[in-house]
Amino acid sequence: MSFASEMKNELTRIDVDEMNAKAELSALIRMNGALSLSNQQFVINVQTENATTARRIYSLIKRVFNVEVEILVRKKMKLKKNNIYICRTKMKAKEILDELGILKDGIFTHEIDHSMIQDDEMRRSYLRGAFLAGGSVNNPETSSYHLEIFSQNESHAEGLTKLMNSYELNAKHLERKKGSITYLKEAEKISDFLSLIGGYQALLKFEDVRIVRDMRNSVNRLVNCETANLNKTVSAAMKQVESIKLIDKEIGIENLPDRLREIARIRVEHQEISLKELGEMVSTGPISKSGVNHRLRKLNDLADKIRNGEQIEL
């Protein structure tokens, strides 16, 4: 089962009172529902590919409106041959849509009805219904952080974005070919949203994975930084040894001033050690990294003069 499916499974088990059930149903039916006419009778069909979401729709409609609901199962004929679940009720169809703020004076509305988001709990319930209807979230173990809710209508996507941003989630929306999506990209905001709609088990799993990923990324950055520094140190040491060998060949290390002669010999004998360690091996007492670096630069400058055929003064 995918992370998103596990999360939806958890959300469908949340107990809600009648008002919050209506808010959740309002989102579910507005986003996944359709009204049809059969035998001169209005029929509500609410479609989903998630079995637990279908059971949730079934139980909420039955409980809140005390009407008969049936669940039909169809096989999807496209590439992914998943089941499609259709929750259908032929009773009080117009009354249900009126009460959920979906139908106004016989006209379908795309905006979120204010009566469905009167207080904090109802707003959370509406967002939960919206996620159950059209939401998806990437598995945090295998991909980048991304949560989105698909809406067929742009004005509803805008309303969702505004509703989510009332909780400072930094949600954004954009148009797609067959509708619009409202999405979150920041891991912290996704965590906040999971908590907001009651997905606490999903939140714990998401946070566990996020902590491990962040730690792994930090370690990788540290290793990369240390590797780069090591490569830089090795490259500098090789250049220093090359310069010292040239000096020894052309004028002899023994002819160098004492402080340059000693550091030259230590560097050739200990090519792998750092400037700090070089400074600690000087016989006259430890010298600083900058002091060691200054002497090695002198040797490099001297080697450059030899390469360029310049006059050497020791």
Curated annotation (Swiss-Prot):
Domain of life of the organism encoding this protein: Bacteria
GO molecular function terms listed in the Swiss-Prot or TrEMBL record: DNA binding
UniProt signal peptide: none
Transport found in the keyword field: no
SUPFAM superfamilies: Homing endonucleases (SSF55608)
A single BP term in Gene Ontology: cell division
DNA-binding residue intervals: 274-308
Keywords linked to the UniProt accession: Cell cycle, Cell division, DNA-binding
Xref: InterPro entries: Homing_endonucl (IPR027434), Sporu_reg_WhiA_N_dom (IPR018478), Sporulation_regulator_WhiA (IPR003802), Sporulation_regulator_WhiA_C (IPR023054), WhiA_LAGLIDADG_dom (IPR039518)
NCBIfam families in the cross-refs: DNA_bind_WhiA
PANTHER family, A to Z: CELL DIVISION PROTEIN WHIA-RELATED (PTHR37307:SF1)
UniProt record similarity statement: Belongs to the WhiA family.
Function (record text): Involved in cell division and chromosome segregation.
HAMAP family: HTH_type_WhiA
The name this protein goes by in its record: Probable cell division protein WhiA
Organism of derivation: Staphylococcus aureus (strain NCTC 8325 / PS 47)
